[in-house]
Amino acid sequence: MTDKLIIRGGKKLAGTLQVDGAKNSAVALIPAAILAESEVVLEGLPDISDVHTLYNILEELGGTVRYDNKTAVIDPTDMISMPLPSGNVKKLRASYYLMGAMLGRFKKAVIGLPGGCYLGPRPIDQHIKGFEALGAKVTNEQGAIYLRADELKGARIYLDVVSVGATINIMLAAVRAKGKTVIENAAKEPEIIDVATLLTNMGAIIKGAGTDTIRITGVEHLHGCHHTIIPDRIEAGTFMVLAAASGKGVRIENVIPTHLEGIIAKLTEMGVPMDIEEDAIFVGEVEKIKKVDIKTYAYPGFPTDLQQPLTALLTRAEGSSVITDTIYPSRFKHIAEIERMGGKFKLEGRSAVINGPVQLQGSKVTATDLRAGAALVIAALLADGETEIHGVEHIERGYSKIIEKLSAIGANITRSSAAETKL
């Protein structure tokens, strides 16, 4: 049986929320440790299921992982390249970073096809194109990807689609290849800079991370290092939206405001008062939310990952707001759930029209993916009465200790296993 969250809405929240390390960095930094030949220490990792799944996978490969609080000590010295069945790999989409890392270190890898949130077609063809350009032979046999290379040689690779996953994966494979690699039309996300920083600390030579052209000069060996992960800009943005929806003064700590320009701009346009500090953001209470139109784009544009949480807040806005997702046009599964709570929406192609303001009512809803889960939590906090959210495991894939964090600022939120309620 899956567990559920029970939230009694209508309370005004106040206090401080701490942002954890970036999920989208963590799932790449941990596989990147495979490339080193001595101990790698990663600090500030989020305590989420994806991270623990990756520790298990590294141990399956013969590595050792010591984990304490938010720090992991990874010793990749005795790792060997062995086929990774789809058990753990199926649990997370970002297991594809194991391909680049294992190819970079061992020149071969066998990996079951990755899992994670299902957001429509997100194929890994750009990753494979990059690996092939570096000299790997890639085949798909019985639902597993086989990668083999006699040697990896630097190449010029143009990505047809700006892809964070492909950019990082090619970086991982190229840092120990012979000669120079150039990735053109590379993604520019902060998480890419974070991975490049780790690799550089390990002895890699990388220029241009964070721009659309990344240049890598291959080296033979990489060594261990200490690295502190960047804060999670999507968790920070989710907390900002939540504070605007239900807060009466919420301070969000451990943030990098320059990573949050898209959401800061839109909340400002909606009339949300904010104080931006060096590494914290204070969100004040807001009486009336103004309607806005939003289009998601690749970084530094408005992130697709915050589109769903924002939908919940916009049920409070006066008039019709339009959200257009240019990245994942089918990312609107949460809307049917918020409609059960009384939300008024119209779907038009890759856009959703949100008509407000409406007072949401508690209901039974289901989180279909990670950010839909965040949207439903915000909707439940806004609603009159009690909301039951099923599919908690989706939420916990990306938000660590969400119940403790929200309870600490006054939310009435508990978890119950669905089995208990049947007795």
From Swiss-Prot:
Presence of the UniProt keyword DNA-binding in the record: no
Cross-referenced InterPro entries: Enolpyruvate_Tfrase_dom, Enolpyruvate_Tfrase_sf, MurA_subfamily, RNA3'P_cycl/enolpyr_Trfase_a/b, UDP_GlcNAc_COvinyl_MurA
Molecular function via GO: UDP-N-acetylglucosamine 1-carboxyvinyltransferase activity
GO cellular component, one term: cytoplasm
HAMAP family in alphabetical order: MurA
Keywords: Cell cycle, Cell division, Cell shape, Cell wall biogenesis/degradation, Cytoplasm, Peptidoglycan synthesis, Pyruvate, Transferase
Protein's name in the database: UDP-N-acetylglucosamine 1-carboxyvinyltransferase 2
Reaction(s) catalysed by this chain's protein: phosphoenolpyruvate + UDP-N-acetyl-alpha-D-glucosamine = UDP-N-acetyl-3-O-(1-carboxyvinyl)-alpha-D-glucosamine + phosphate
Major place of residence: cytoplasm
Pathway given in the UniProt record: Cell wall biogenesis; peptidoglycan biosynthesis
Binding-site residues for UDP-N-acetyl-alpha-D-glucosamine, renumbered to this chain: R93, R122, P123, I124, D125, Q126, D305, I327
Record-annotated active site: C117
Known role: Cell wall formation. Adds enolpyruvyl to UDP-N-acetylglucosamine.
Keyword Cell cycle in record: yes
The organism of origin for this protein: Listeria monocytogenes serotype 4b (strain F2365)
Residues recorded with modification 2-(S-cysteinyl)pyruvic acid O-phosphothioketal: C117
Gene Ontology process terms (BP): cell division; cell wall organization; peptidoglycan biosynthetic process; regulation of cell shape; UDP-N-acetylgalactosamine biosynthetic process
Gene3D superfamilies, A to Z: Enolpyruvate transferase domain (3.65.10.10)
The enzyme's E.C. designation: 2.5.1.7
Enzyme class, spelled out: transferase
Annotated positions binding phosphoenolpyruvate: K23, N24
Family: Belongs to the EPSP synthase family. MurA subfamily.
Subcellular location as annotated: Cytoplasm
